Amino acid sequence: EDVLQYQSSVEKACKDAGISQFSTVMLAMMQQESSGLGTDVLQCSECPFNTNYDNTPNAITDPYYSIQVGAEYFAYCLKEAGCRSIKNTERLKIALQDYNFGNSYATWVLENYGTYTVENATEFSLMMQNTLGWSSYGDPEYVDHVLRYYIAS
């Protein structure tokens, strides 16, 4: 499988970012984001932790840099969601959706609902679409799309 070629790199990046226990989740995220294909394997070109490439879709041309940035950004999302353990699945879901939306979902959902649901993720997506004038905003079902690939270790 294309994602598994990056397993050791994901494990190292997660260790460096202080989120070693989440490396298998990151592999599932990579499967959802790119199936391990292309160069921006974690689709994080637009992420604020990307300082080496343009902040436009698929601008990252080094898969290992994409993994590094993705791990740093996911560590930030986990912190925003208050998720300190892989076993805290409710907070993990918030962190995953925050990674996909890229901005402020964790804070918003914790203030308004306290937990992730597809319904409140859809509400947030529509709110951001309207605010930004975009035709779509993220994937409100990202959590389920990632977790179908996740195998707890």
Task: Mark where each language-model region is.
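Non-catalytic cell-wall polysaccharide-engagement segments
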Residues: 1-3, 9, 51-68, 72, ...
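N-terminal carbohydrate-binding/catalytic regions of secreted carbohydrate-active enzymes
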Residues: 4-20, 24-25, 29
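Generic recognition of cysteine residues
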Residues: 14, 44-47, 77, 83
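Short, functionally critical alpha-helical segments immediately adjacent to catalytic or ligand/cofactor-binding
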Residues: 20-37, 44, 67-71, 95-101, ...
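Glycine- and aromatic-rich loop/turn segments at beta-sheet edges
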Residues: 38-47, 117-118
